[in-house]
Amino acid sequence: MTAEKIRGVNLGNWLVLERWMEPELFRGTDAEDETWLRRLLPAKELERRLKEHRESWITEADLKWIAGQGLNLVRIPVPWFLFGDRAPYESCVEYLDRAFLWAERYGLKVLIDLHTTPGNQNGYDNGGLVGVCRWHRDPEEVEYVLTVLTRLGARYGNREGLFGIEVLNEPISWLVYHSAPTTGRARDREESRGSGHVPLKFLRTFYLEAYRRLREVMPEDKAVVFHDGFRLTAWNAFFRRGGMKNVYLDTHQYIWAMEMFLPFHKPFVYRLFLGHAEKQIRKVQKAVPVLVGEWCICTRHASFLRNHRYEGKGTDILGTRLKELSEFTDSVMADADRHRGLVGKLEQKEAEALQSVEQSVEQFLRERKEALQEKQRERYREVADMELRTWESTAGWIYWSYKLCGNRRLTAGESWKYGWDFRRCVRRGWIGEESNG
């Protein structure tokens, strides 16, 4: 696997929940994250929803489809409580067991990604508790996470399907912490007391210990993956001196996130962003292979497309047809005696004109929809192509995410989510080519 470029997709929102990816799961509550969903839902209802969701969100058919697209890896985010040894959290490790069976059946590798920690490592909803980031300040919880990693390594270390284990997802830097929209937004202010960014010194120490413990239970042909902590260029010396074998540095690169801070949402800006990222990646790869573990083609340039060439055209067609009808009616009524016998023809003409209007507007709407879809497809493919060219300089890439919002049709207000959904991107021709395999 190490000699082969990684081409993968994340199985997000399966074992680690994110409200924006499937709001239906959070219905009836105002919870922003999984922790508060668990606190607010009655226990029986929570159990029912979680079971229904986990049984259906990812199935064997999904992994078969993924393999059929020519991908070779799935990254599976898992929560810190997946072994179910802390009440009231239930085990979900059996679903990870299933994923390994399916992955091995279809020739896929699995990257296990420890996505959350007790107390959160970034303050995001994907860390399980919005606005709280204090895991790293509690030595007992740090030790607990290390034991979770050890158990994962012992359980799956010799599985054919294991690519590796990522020890921690997105531990947050000072800069990102202080610019994140979730910082300071904890529902329980007391619970967030002591929150702050994850210092680089702590992270290096934690990574070294995590590597040591994983290597005690996991062979060297299985990779250990470290997230860059939003500090991509800070790791050169660390990996040169560490004496580590078969390790990767994971970086997450989102144009969508970059756009939040810039007023220009155009391809030339994307090229500048990607060019800078590629320059940094090439520099870091002299010390360690770099993996783009999360990215997507969602951009404001494509998601919020409006084509002004077609605006108003439907009104023009409708107005023209109604004007013709009105002029004909006026001419008949102006000389009613002479045209008394034409009343039947007038009614027929009126019906034909109205039918013509309906057909013309339907045709216009169909053509406009097709034109907008093609324009949007071109824009998404342009972004996909420039990103994929950039990732060619890396050890590989993993798309975020496989699916969003189940199979339901997204509302107009949710249409921006399509670019995060790999299945829909493939089926709409925005990236790759769908296979029948």
Positions of predicted regions on the chain:
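Acidic (Asp/Glu)-rich catalytic clusters
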Residues: K64-G70, E104-R105, A154-E160, F238-Y248, ...
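Aromatic-rich peripheral "rim/lid" segments of glycoside hydrolase catalytic domains that contact
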Residues: A336-G437
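N-terminal carbohydrate-binding accessory modules
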Residues: M1-L71
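Hydrophobic faces of well-ordered beta-strands that scaffold small-molecule active sites
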Residues: K5-L11, V74-I76, V110-L114, F163-I165, ...
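Extracellular glycoside hydrolase catalytic/binding regions
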Residues: G161, I172-E382
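Surface-exposed, active-site-proximal loop segments in enzymatic domains
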Residues: W80-Y95, N120-E140, L175-T182, R189-S192, ...
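Short, solvent-exposed loop/turn elements at domain surfaces
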Residues: L15-M21, M258-E259, R300-H301, R408
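An active-site-proximal structural segment forming one wall of the substrate-binding cleft
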Residues: E47-V74, G84, P88-T116, N126-V167, ...
